[in-house]
Swiss-Prot record, chain A:
The small GTPases Rab are key regulators of intracellular membrane trafficking, from the formation of transport vesicles to their fusion with membranes. Rabs cycle between an inactive GDP-bound form and an active GTP-bound form that is able to recruit to membranes different set of downstream effectors directly responsible for vesicle formation, movement, tethering and fusion. That Rab is mainly involved in the biosynthetic transport of proteins from the Golgi to the plasma membrane. Regulates, for instance, SLC2A4/GLUT4 glucose transporter-enriched vesicles delivery to the plasma membrane. (Microbial infection) Upon Legionella pneumophila infection promotes endoplasmic reticulum recruitment and bacterial replication. Plays a role in remodeling the Legionella-containing vacuole (LCV) into an endoplasmic reticulum-like vacuole. A motif (Switch 2) lies at residues 64-81. Switch 1, switch 2 and the interswitch regions are characteristic of Rab GTPases and mediate the interactions with Rab downstream effectors. The switch regions undergo conformational changes upon nucleotide binding which drives interaction with specific sets of effector proteins, with most effectors only binding to GTP-bound Rab. The gene is RAB10. Mg(2+) binds at residues 23, 41, 64. PANTHER family: LD44762P. A lipid is attached at residues 199-200 (S-geranylgeranyl cysteine). PROSITE patterns: RAB. It is found in: Cytoplasmic vesicle membrane; Golgi apparatus membrane; Golgi apparatus, trans-Golgi network membrane; Endosome membrane. This is Ras-related protein Rab-10. Its cofactor is Mg(2+). Interacts with MYO5A; mediates the transport to the plasma membrane of SLC2A4/GLUT4 storage vesicles. Interacts with GDI1 and with GDI2; negatively regulates RAB10 association with membranes and activation. Interacts (GDP-bound form) with LLGL1; the interaction is direct and promotes RAB10 association with membranes and activation through competition with the Rab inhibitor GDI1. Interacts with EXOC4; probably associates with the exocyst. It comes from Homo sapiens (Human). GTP binds at residues 18-24, 35-36, 40-41, 67, 122-123, 125-126, 152-154. GO terms for molecular function: cadherin binding involved in cell-cell adhesion; G protein activity; GDP binding; GTP binding; myosin V binding.
């Protein structure tokens, strides 16, 4: 396609329990908007956002998964092509925090070994309803050697920072190539196999 | 519920027949009152026999037998009462189960991992996971294609692609659709892209 509108394509994935705000986090980042009504994601969806890092235009294709158990067989098939995974929990929902180890295990089982991981404690604007101390999030992130942010899609806290940091971490691992030798293909986004494109 | 009126009737009969009436009753309908009536009748007749020591001997045994009969009658009526309550409870239980059963149909026979689907429910589950997977894949594919087309349209609108190159560009797009299976078009595409966007990448780097 006449699309050298970007230099690199990174594929990211959002996972975590149902209702923690994965879709809202993504919506804030891609459209800078927030919607309070809860609409459960059906299976899997994605959004595109192009950012500029170190003079490179990086197209982020961000896959948003349904947290509900009944979609897991569909969503886990999308782990494989992800270069970065954001694991989201809700600081007002203890269960969503307890399930982090389960999600991390899912990553180990289904994602690429060198996938860049990040932990997000969302809804940090709701401090009066907080049940997960920030320290606990930091601790579990440290134990697994991954980055951690507390975010709020509603109050727009740390959302862009989280995505840009994850993209930077992936960029750092990306071998430098002659920019125009990239031939990335976003039109096959639906299939896992579509991502064997030479984008990394 | 049926017994008390019956008993009353019997008592009335008994009253009419005098204490002797108790001796004519069915042993299964005997009450403690009847036993006392029988005791009264027998005691009276024993007294009439005089004070022979053998009669006295016999009297002790008769009293003992009557006491035993009294105990058995009391015990029996208690058991009947308990059984009657038990029967009423079970009747209610059966009634309830029958009502549930007619609502839930054959559910009782299903295994632990089975589910009953209400065929009249318009929102009942009816598609398979594979079907959902296919639809989602197609949706996401179309969505990404739309994004590509939108970007391309933006290029035309902003004048990045000169109008005279329009037809060529369009032909190129046709080739792009089948790009995955056509490696040669890749090269062609890249050169065109490079031509069209060289000033852009120059600006970026």
């Amino acid at each position: 396609m006449a699309k050298k509108t970007y230099d690199l394509l990174f594929k990211l994935l959002l996972i975590g329990d149902s209702g923690v705000g994965k879709t809202c986090v993504l919506f804030r980042f891609s459209d800078d908007a927030f919607n309070t009504t809860f609409i459960s994601t059906i299976g899997i969806d994605f959004k595109i956002k192009t950012v500029e890092l170190q003079g490179k235009k990086i197209k982020l294709q961000i896959w948003d998964t349904a947290g509900q158990e009944r979609f897991h067989t569909i969503t886990t098939s999308y782990y494989r092509g992800a270069m970065g995974i954001m694991l989201v929990y809700d600081i007002t929902n203890g269960k969503s925090f307890e399930n982090i180890s389960k999600w991390l295990r899912n990553i180990d089982e289904h994602a690429n070994e060198d996938v860049e991981r990040m932990l997000l404690g969302n809804k940090c604007d709701m401090d009066d309803k907080r049940v997960v101390p920030k320290g606990k999030g930091e601790q579990i992130a440290r134990e697994h050697g991954i980055r951690f942010f507390e975010t709020s899609a509603k109050a727009n806290i740390n959302i862009e920072k989280a995505f840009l940091t994850l993209a930077e971490d992936i960029l750092r691992k990306t071998p430098v190539k002659e920019p125009n030798s990239e031939n990335v293909d976003i039109s096959s986004g639906g299939g896992v196999t579509g991502w064997k494109s030479k984008c990394c | 519920m049926e017994e008390p009126p019956l008993r009353e009737e019997e008592e009335e009969e008994g009253d009419e027949a005098g204490p002797e009436g108790a001796l004519g009753k069915s042993p299964f309908q005997l009450t403690a009152e009847d036993v006392y009536d029988i005791s009264y009748v027998m005691g009276r007749e024993l007294m009439a026999l005089g004070s022979d020591p053998r009669v006295t001997q016999l009297q002790f045994k008769i009293v003992r037998v009557l006491e035993m009969l009294e105990t058995l009658v009391n015990e029996g009526s208690l058991t009947v009462e308990e059984l009657r309550m038990e029967r009423d409870n079970l009747r209610k239980e059966v009634e309830g189960l029958r009502r549930e059963g007619s609502a839930a149909g054959r559910e009782v026979n299903l295994g632990p991992d089975k589910m009953v689907v209400d065929l009249t429910d318009p929102n009942r589950p009816r598609f398979t996971l594979q079907e959902l997977r296919d639809v989602l894949q197609e949706r996401n594919k179309l969505k990404s294609q739309l994004l590509v087309v939108q970007e391309e349209l933006q290029c035309y609108k902003s004048g990045l692609i000169p109008a005279r190159e329009g037809p060529g560009g369009r032909r190129e797009k046709g080739a792009l659709v089948t790009r995955a299976s056509n490696a040669s078009s890749n090269k062609e595409e890249k050169t065109i892209i490079r031509k069209l966007f060289s000033f852009r990448s120059g600006k970026q780097t």
